[in-house]
UniProtKB/Swiss-Prot annotation:
Chitin-binding type R&R domain boundaries: 9-87
Stored InterPro entries: CHIT_BIND_RR_consensus (IPR031311), Cuticle_Struct_Prot (IPR050468), Insect_cuticle (IPR000618)
Lineage per the UniProt record: Eukaryota, Metazoa, Ecdysozoa, Arthropoda, Chelicerata
GO molecular function per UniProt: structural constituent of chitin-based larval cuticle
Coiled-coil residues: none
Primary role: Component of the rigid cuticle of the spider.
The keyword Protein transport appears for this protein: no
Example of a GO cellular component annotation carried by this entry: chitin-based extracellular matrix
Disulphide bridges, residue numbers: none
Keyword Lipid biosynthesis included in the entry's annotation: no
Pfam families: Chitin_bind_4
Protein name per Swiss-Prot or TrEMBL: Adult-specific rigid cuticular protein 11.9
Keywords carried by this UniProt record: Cuticle
Organism field: Araneus diadematus (European garden spider)
Length: 120
């Protein structure tokens, strides 16, 4: 693996290259609030993918191999088509209309069945 770095006066640059089967590499430089660089790698299909980027007050902008790999996407779409589909839920029934059911209440005072008898 190769690596280099330089920092001076608020600016920097660095880079590395792994040199392995994954072929990872990256270079970047920046000054103040702006950064520019690129990275690359070898994807699962054996293709080298390279992305260039800049970042600063306007946000992050990438170009190059930033899209989906067409071969991988086609295989993924075929597999997704075979996957079981989620059931479509039945529409929920509307709630029942409110209704009123009065409950009979015993009176608070009841007459005695034998009448009232006063004893003095």
């Amino acid at each position: 693996a190769d690596m280099g770095m330089n920092i001076a006066g608020g600016a920097y640059n660095f880079g590395y290259n792994t040199g392995d089967a994954g072929g990872h590499s990256r270079v970047e430089s920046g000054s103040g609030s702006s950064v520019a660089g690129s990275y690359s790698y070898v994807d699962a299909n054996g293709d080298r993918r390279t992305v260039q980027y800049t970042a600063g007050p306007g946000g992050y902008q990438a170009s190059g191999d930033v899209g989906v790999d067409r071969r991988t996407a086609a295989a993924a779409a075929a597999l997704a088509a075979m996957a079981p589909k989620a059931p479509i839920p039945a529409p929920a029934a509307a709630p029942a209309a409110p209704w009123y059911n009065p409950v009979p209440v015993a009176p608070a005072i009841m007459a005695h069945p034998g009448g009232y008898i006063a004893k003095w």
